[in-house]
């Protein structure tokens, strides 16, 4: 009974938390990639 309550309370938050963390990580990586490309373009244009 305790395990079932624990799993019901922790299941959805863990899944949602993982999805949020993954989305933030993807956004962070994409920002770094685009910033890196912009820096390369600026340095090659000079």
Swiss-Prot record:
Coiled coil: none annotated. The keyword Cell membrane does not apply. One of its GO terms (biological process) is tricarboxylic acid cycle. The keyword Transit peptide does not apply. Keywords: Membrane, Mitochondrion, Mitochondrion inner membrane, Tricarboxylic acid cycle. Pathway: Carbohydrate metabolism; tricarboxylic acid cycle. It is found in: Mitochondrion inner membrane. It is a peripheral membrane protein. One of its GO terms (cellular component) is respiratory chain complex II (succinate dehydrogenase). Component of complex II composed of eight subunits in plants: four classical SDH subunits SDH1, SDH2, SDH3 and SDH4 (a flavoprotein (FP), an iron-sulfur protein (IP), and a cytochrome b composed of a large and a small subunit.), as well as four subunits unknown in mitochondria from bacteria and heterotrophic eukaryotes. This is Succinate dehydrogenase subunit 8, mitochondrial. It comes from Arabidopsis thaliana (Mouse-ear cress).
